[in-house]
Amino acid sequence: SDLADCRLMAFENVDQATKLWIKGRHFSIARLLGSNISHEQFALLIFRLAPQDYHRFHAPVDGVVGPPKWLEGEYYTVNPMAIRSAIDVYGENTRVVIPITTHDFGTVYLVAIGAMMVGSIVMTAQQGQHVQRNDELGYFKFGGSTLVLLVDAARVQWDDDLLVNSDACIETLVRVGMRMGHARTLPDSVGEETRPR
């Protein structure tokens, strides 16, 4: 479910996101996460919080919070014009990468990205804590900010309205707890039956 009151963009893969929305010349999933994880496997959602929005963010899935990784950086603005410029706002801004291990989606990565006028990102969930969907994970101090959610593309199907709007480069206004998509049904490794994951 949606993890913040914000403006949302949904992409079925990273290549689509960089073609339509993220124009930073050095953007990569490896740089965003501060690791060498390949980008091919991920579908992603981008949540842009404006200064007037509620700045707490919540668990999008049920799971266990892994060790957060803090990456120091800049505080560039996260408005759409900046995201579509040559600056890699997501890979250069201060951010925290929060892995959440889930039953339905494998490990998902939530990246909280600080922005202009945001002094810090505050984590309220702890490593090893089991969270339920919509439990608070943390908050941004006042200002604009962004969250990026990375999910194994083979395990998730975003809602059609989000994909249609994003394909037209239109952000969708969403609220905490609203549906974003669902787990795909994957073939059972033992037989022909399918089961939700």
Task: List where the protein language model places each region.
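Contiguous, well-folded functional domains in the mature portion of proteins
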Residues: 1-197
